Regions:
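Short beta-strand element of the alpha/beta-hydrolase
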Residues: 33-41
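Alpha/beta-hydrolase-fold enzymes
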Residues: 112-196
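Catalytic nucleophile-loop/oxyanion-hole region of alpha/beta-hydrolase
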Residues: 43-45, 72-106, 270
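Short beta-strand/loop motif that positions the catalytic acidic residue
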Residues: 217, 223-225, 229
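N-terminal cap/lid segment of alpha/beta-hydrolase-fold proteins
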Residues: 1-30
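Catalytic active-site module of serine/aspartate enzymes centered on a nucleophile-bearing elbow/loop
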Residues: 250-282
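Conserved alpha/beta-hydrolase
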Residues: 48, 53-76
Length: 282
C-alpha cells in the first residue's frame, strides 16, 4: 500500500429541516481509491476522528466526517433530534456530496458508538448507497441500565416538552485507557454532555429497529468492539452481528479495550485491521 500526504478542507450543507451541517474532508494526494464517510458518537464531533482520517488518506482513501446536528460546529439545539431519521438524511447528503466529488469509486460508512447505530440503521434503510458498513462499539444497548424513572420521564416529556434536557452521564474515563485521549475529550470545548427527552425516545426507537433489521444487511460488514467496553454492552454487538445476513461479515473484538477502540492504547492494530479490510474490498 502506497502512503501519501493529504489535503484537508471544511464545508457545510443544508441538512434535514434546514439545519446547517458542518463537515470536513481529507483527500489523498493521488486519485482516491474509495470514499470513507465517518459518523461520530454522542456529544462529540468529527474532528476527534482527524487522526483516523489522516491515517486513511495515507492508504489512498478519502475521508469525509460530518458533525451531526446538535453537535460540534453544526446547527441545532445541542443533543436534540426531532426524529432519528434526520441523522440519516444528513448522512445521506454527506454521502452524495462525497460521491459527486469522487464518482465511480466505492463508498464505505464507518460509525462510532451513536454513529455506529446511525451507520447500521442507514445501511439497513439505504443499502444501495453503500458498498460496506463498519460499526465500532455501535450504541445498540448501554452497559449501565438506564433507570426506569428516566425512561418514563423521557417518554412522557418527548411529546409535551421534547427539548427538555438531561445529562448523558457518560464517564470520560471509560472511553480509553489512554489518559491523553480522556484529557483532550474533557477539555474539548466542542464536546457536550446533554441529550433531550425527544432524543432519548428516538434513540430507543432506532436501537430496536436496527437490532430487528440486522437481517436486512447483505453488504460487507466489519463490526468492531472493545472487549472491556463499559459504555456499550459488547453482548448486544455480538447479538447484532449474529443476525447480519451478509456472507461477508467480520467481528473483531479487542480484548481489554474500552469503548473507543480506535483511540485506545494499542489502536495501531485496530487501524491496521481497518486498512486491511477496506483494501480487500475495493
Amino acid at each position: 500500500l502506497s502512503k501519501t500526504s493529504s489535503q484537508h478542507t471544511e464545508g457545510s450543507f443544508e441538512g434535514a429541516r434546514g439545519t446547517q451541517i458542518f463537515y470536513q474532508t481529507w483527500k489523498p494526494s493521488g486519485k482516491a481509491k474509495a470514499i470513507v464517510v465517518i459518523a461520530h458518537g454522542i456529544g462529540e464531533h468529527g474532528a476527534r476522528y482527524a487522526h483516523i482520517a489522516g491515517h486513511l488518506t495515507r492508504f489512498g482513501f478519502t475521508a469525509w466526517a460530518l458533525d451531526h446536528r446538535g453537535h460540534g460546529r453544526s446547527g441545532g439545539k445541542r443533543g436534540h433530534v426531532e426524529s432519528f431519521d434526520d441523522y440519516l438524511t444528513d448522512v445521506g447528503q454527506m454521502i452524495r456530496i462525497a460521491k459527486d466529488h469522487h464518482p465511480g469509486i466505492k463508498t464505505f460508512l464507518v460509525g462510532y458508538s451513536l454513529g455506529g447505530l446511525i451507520a447500521a440503521y442507514f445501511a439497513e434503510k439505504h443499502p444501495s448507497e453503500l458498498d460496506g458498513l463498519i460499526a465500532s462499539g455501535p450504541a445498540l444497548r448501554e452497559k449501565m441500565k438506564v433507570p426506569a424513572v428516566k425512561v418514563f420521564l423521557a417518554k412522557t416529556l418527548s411529546g409535551i416538552m421534547p427539548t427538555f434536557t438531561n445529562n448523558t452521564g457518560l464517564d470520560p474515563n471509560l472511553l480509553s485507557h489512554d489518559k491523553e485521549v480522556v484529557r483532550k475529550y474533557v477539555e474539548d470545548p466542542l464536546v457536550h454532555k446533554v441529550v433531550t427527552a425527544r432524543w432519548f425516545t428516538e434513540y430507543r426507537r432506532a436501537q430496536n429497529e436496527t437490532m430487528q433489521g440486522a437481517e436486512k444487511l447483505t453488504m460487507p460488514c466489519l463490526i468492531i468492539q472493545g472487549g472491556a467496553d463499559g459504555i456499550i454492552d459488547p453482548s448486544a454487538t455480538n447479538e447484532f452481528f449474529k443476525k447480519i445476513k451478509s456472507s461477508d461479515k467480520t467481528l473483531k473484538v479487542y480484548e481489554g479495550f474500552y469503548h473507543e477502540s480506535m483511540n485506545e492504547v494499542g489502536k495501531e492494530s485496530v487501524l491496521g485491521d481497518l486498512d486491511t479490510w477496506l483494501a480487500a474490498r475495493i
